[in-house]
Each structure stands twice: as structure tokens, then as C-alpha cells.
């Protein structure tokens, strides 16, 4: 393995603290792409929202995610207040990796058809030196596309999925709000 420890950007949802941490490097796995990062893009809208969410109070978090708040109330009714608070604290104590606009070079293709070591790929993987990428959310990058330009692919995919959900027709006009 070329890397034993790598650096990754994570956020602690309980405190809102974002930091660069040393984590064990993923190893080769059948059905996964092991990718060394060459570029990673920060989505100002989505990632800023996540950082601000993490910095918010418990009340703020509940207001932003009413469906999870309802699940918490149901858990209190079924398991009690102490067990529910313990579960929430445990969940908020787990750092989450940030990022989803990733470009890199395949180190190990994990026997995934259509990919080989050395391929340049774009994926929805987090900001880290080496990632284990899902082939379902990865694509080979054409030679004519730079790594820098390829990092924008996941942002375009999010917009495209929005259009699919909207079921917009080519003749229709749509308004995009949020820009991130």
C-alpha cells in the first residue's frame, strides 16, 4: 500500500469544528476504486450549509431537519429520554468527511469492469488524499478534459438530477436558485 495514513477534511457535527485530520488510508477492495486525489473542489453552497449546520445549536439543527426531529420524538417515546440523548450525542460525536467533487487517478480498480489502474476519474468522494470510490458514482475522464474542469462534474450532476426530478422539457424555462 502506498499510503498508511492520509489527511482528510472532516467536520464534527456536535461542535461544528472543521479540521484536517490523519486517518487510516483505505485499502484495495473488490468492487471499489482506490483513487489518489489530484483535485478536489469545495462546493460553496452545500459545504457551507453543512459547516453552518454543524455550528448550530441542537434547537437550530432540529428546526433545519424537522423530519429528524420527529424521529427523535418517536425514539424518546419508545426508548426513553436518556437513551435518545445518548444516541444523539454519539451520532454528533462522529466526524463526517466533507466534500463530494473529487478527481484522481485509480491506484487499484478492484476488479470493477470499465476501470483500470492509471485511469483518471471523477467521483463524488470526499476531500482526502486517497479515497475508496463507488464505481456507481465515478466516471473516467476524457483526455481532452483537465482535472480542474472535471471537478465540476458532480455539481453539474446535482443540477441535472434536479431537472430530472422536475421533469422539465427542453422547451420549458426553469429558474435555478441557490447556486450551490
Language-model-detected regions and their locations in the chain:
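Short structural boundary motif marking the start of a folded domain
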Residues: 2-9
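Short glycine/threonine/proline-enriched tight-turn/helix- or strand-capping micro-motif at secondary-structure
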Residues: 16-23
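Glycine-rich beta-strand-centered segment in the early N-terminal region that forms part
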Residues: 26-41, 50, 54-124
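A glycine-rich, Thr/Ser-enriched phosphate-binding loop motif common to dinucleotide/cofactor-binding enzymes
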Residues: 98-100, 124, 142-167, 177-180
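Flexible, gly/ser-rich surface segments that form the specificity/activation loops bordering the active-site cleft
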Residues: 125-130
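Short, compositionally biased
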Residues: 131-145
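Conserved class I S-adenosyl-L-methionine
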Residues: 172-176
Amino acid at each position: 500500500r502506498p499510503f498508511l495514513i492520509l489527511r482528510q477534511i472532516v467536520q464534527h457535527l456536535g461542535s461544528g469544528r472543521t479540521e484536517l485530520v490523519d486517518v487510516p488510508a483505505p485499502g484495495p477492495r473488490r468492487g471499489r476504486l482506490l483513487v489518489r486525489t489530484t483535485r478536489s473542489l469545495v462546493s460553496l453552497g452545500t459545504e457551507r450549509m453543512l459547516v453552518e449546520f454543524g455550528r448550530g445549536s441542537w434547537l437550530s439543527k432540529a428546526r433545519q431537519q424537522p423530519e429528524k426531529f420527529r424521529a427523535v420524538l418517536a425514539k424518546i417515546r419508545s426508548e426513553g429520554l436518556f437513551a435518545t440523548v445518548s444516541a444523539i450525542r454519539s451520532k454528533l460525536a462522529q466526524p463526517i468527511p466533507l466534500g463530494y467533487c473529487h478527481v484522481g487517478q485509480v491506484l487499484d480498480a478492484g476488479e470493477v469492469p470499465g476501470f483500470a489502474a492509471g485511469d483518471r476519474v471523477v467521483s463524488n468522494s470526499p476531500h482526502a488524499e486517497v479515497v475508496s470510490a463507488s464505481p456507481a458514482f465515478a466516471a473516467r475522464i476524457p483526455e481532452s478534459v483537465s482535472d480542474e474542469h472535471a471537478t465540476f462534474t458532480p455539481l453539474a450532476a446535482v443540477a441535472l438530477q434536479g431537472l430530472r426530478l422536475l421533469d422539465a422539457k427542453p422547451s420549458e424555462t426553469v429558474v435555478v436558485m441557490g447556486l450551490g
